[in-house]
A protein has these predicted regions:
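Alpha-helical transmembrane segments of multi-pass membrane proteins
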Residues: 1-318
Length: 318
């Protein structure tokens, strides 16, 4: 059958590119000419078997969508090790491979910077205070979650605003302005920090899940509006989420101060900043493979994870 022949051709291509004996045995015994491959693929497409072609081809041949708008994103993650000694075959993907290298370096340096205070001179201090796991997880989640939302929303806003530069300017300006306002307002809620964090993190999670499901439709509805109106609408759409996202970091730092754990300040800032860098590298890696909305869903899960870690952070010293 054409499908069976196509499986053999795809397998031969994989052996040629990544098989253990590809250099010694270039002959596969299978007709690998472009004409034959074209006829087999065309036959499968006419028969409605697109999934067979997508799954069997050497590279990812799925059509581009607004969720995964990456023209050069044709390399599957499990296949990356197979191409390490044949990089000329995937020259368009070198930037993607550099992302993985950057991720490795950022995680390593982030962990080193996070552990340095515990190694040099602060052992006694860390032994005296409770809530250390909460400090680590809480501020790590805030760093990764915030940058996940920021970068994913930039990609979403491009659909409405039609320009990457404008999207970045509007999104970053709105996030910083509204989050700053949220941080300022959070001072009033520090005495009820536990209840406030429950409400804030739960609300952020629900908003992110809503945006992941419906943001594309909402932005599509305003696509024909005047450009100024679209900018105002995008800012208004961002306002409730960004305002709430300004609360957790400020309340976390204020809680440390109320518990007389000011020595954790530098550590918390460092963890938050280091893993913001890690998150900024993770976003394109995840969105290439799983889609931009998946990044927003992951951000929702991360903010929900920050909730129990805040309870541990609140533990008073014995």
């Amino acid at each position: 059958t054409p499908v069976g022949d196509l499986d053999k051709v795809f397998e031969a291509y994989r052996d040629l590119y990544s098989g253990p004996q590809r250099e010694d045995s270039p002959e596969t015994g299978v007709d690998m000419s472009m004409g034959y491959l074209y006829r087999l693929v065309a036959g499968c497409l006419i028969a409605g078997d697109l999934q067979k072609v997508e799954q069997g081809y050497v590279f990812c041949g799925e059509p581009l969508t607004n969720e995964r708008p990456y023209f050069a994103g044709y390399l599957r993650i499990p296949d990356i090790p197979k191409f390490m000694d044949k990089l000329e075959a995937i020259s368009d993907e070198w930037g993607y491979l550099l992302l993985w290298a950057t991720l490795f370096l950022s995680v390593v340096f982030g962990l080193v910077l996070m552990l340095l205070p515990m190694i040099f001179g602060w052992q006694a201090f860390f032994q005296r205070h409770r809530g250390k796991p909460g400090v680590i997880v809480y501020f790590l989640c805030l760093g990764v979650g915030y940058i996940f939302v920021e970068i994913a929303m930039i990609s979403k806003y491009i659909l409405c605003l039609g320009n990457a530069t404008v999207s970045v300017a509007i999104l970053v300006t709105g996030m910083l302005l509204f989050s700053g306002l949220g941080s300022y307002l959070s001072a009033r809620f520090v005495p009820a920090a536990r209840r406030t964090i429950i409400v804030v993190c739960s609300s952020i999670t629900l908003l992110l899940l809503f945006y992941a499901s419906y943001l594309d439709r909402i932005l599509g509805m305003v696509g024909l509006w005047p450009y100024g109106a679209k900018i105002v609408f995008c800012l208004l759409l961002l306002f409730p989420l960004a305002l709430l996202m300004g609360f957790p970091f400020a309340i976390g730092m204020s809680t440390l101060s109320r518990l007389r754990k000011e020595h954790f300040f530098v550590w918390a800032w460092g963890i938050n900043g280091s893993f913001s860098v890690v998150g900024s590298v993770l976003v394109p890696i995840i969105s290439v493979s799983l889609g931009i909305s998946t990044v927003i869903v992951m951000a929702a899960i991360i903010y929900l994870t920050a909730l129990p870690s805040f309870f541990n952070l609140q533990l008073p010293d014995s």
